[in-house]
Amino acid sequence: MKRITLGTSTLSVPNIALGCMRLAGKTQQEAATVLQTALDAGIDFFDHADIYGGGRSEEMFAAAARQAGITRDQVLLQSKCGIRPGFFDFSKAHIIASVEGSLKRLNTDYLDTLLLHRPDTLCEPDEVAAAFDALETSGKVRYFGVSNQHPLQVELLKSTVRQPLLTNQLQLSIMHTPMIDAGFNVNMTHAPSLHHDGMVLEYSRLQKMTIQAWSPFQYGFFDGVFVDNDKFPQLNATLQHIASEHGVSTTALAAAWILRHPASMQVIVGSMDPQRLQDIATASELRISREEWYEIYRAAGNKLP
């Protein structure tokens, strides 16, 4: 498993992480098997959020890890906070309470990383800074980052937050590429030229923030998986051809397509199927060619200027 450095820190992480949102729907034995499979494949980074399964996903992780004999020093734990029923909340009180809840559910004394989940337009940067300072000083959080945030929202936080913001977790897949499309269509007037995200890809590279790619196999906003989907015949034919050339599955190739980008991203995969997880892990060391990357991009329906 290839490892990268998270943002500007010295923290070494695998370039594939396990997203734990679906753990809540598994039995303890099933979850224990998934966690052990991930570790055996070199995936020791686990992504959580306080809202996943209403907190049940974090509880299941702790129970499954205990059953599998997995100790705290074997894993890197990330959680996210800021989403509440019907609104977003980056207040100091909520951030700290959320972390306290995650620590209890995960049965740990600290998180390796904490991300602010979705932008809160009522965010007061001073409150975020105070929360981060308290969590860092108490040893409850080692590193910090954001999720789904525009570069200017990151800059607003950085105006008061002392700690480096190491990551931005963003939706990215072969079938969801707005952060890439805009860069190809500078000085154009058609839809792909619109900067929906403030050139977050280039910003992240300049700031040395690690992009964590979520929903790497989805199209739309949780509309479904594009791999082996009859709705995308050209894309899947291309994936099957290139995957066969490399001796990997189309799913692994879809992850490798993201990892080929020189931004040195981390892919968050959510599979709870042990065999599929082992399969996806083969993407870690796979480096496709520039020509193959562009062929896949075009097969997804994208046109180059």
Q: What are the functions of these language-model segments?
A:
Residues M1-V75, T137, Q218:
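N-terminal binding-site loop/beta-alpha segment at the start of enzyme catalytic domains
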Residues G19-Q29, C81-A93:
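Active-site mouth loops of central-metabolism enzymes
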Residues L18, H48, S79, T113-L116, ...:
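Conserved beta-strand positions
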Residues T27-A38, F90-R105, L152-E155:
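Short, acidic/polar
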Residues D73-P85, Q169-I174:
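A short, structured active-site edge motif that brings together acidic residues
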Residues I43, T108-L111, V141, L165:
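A structural motif
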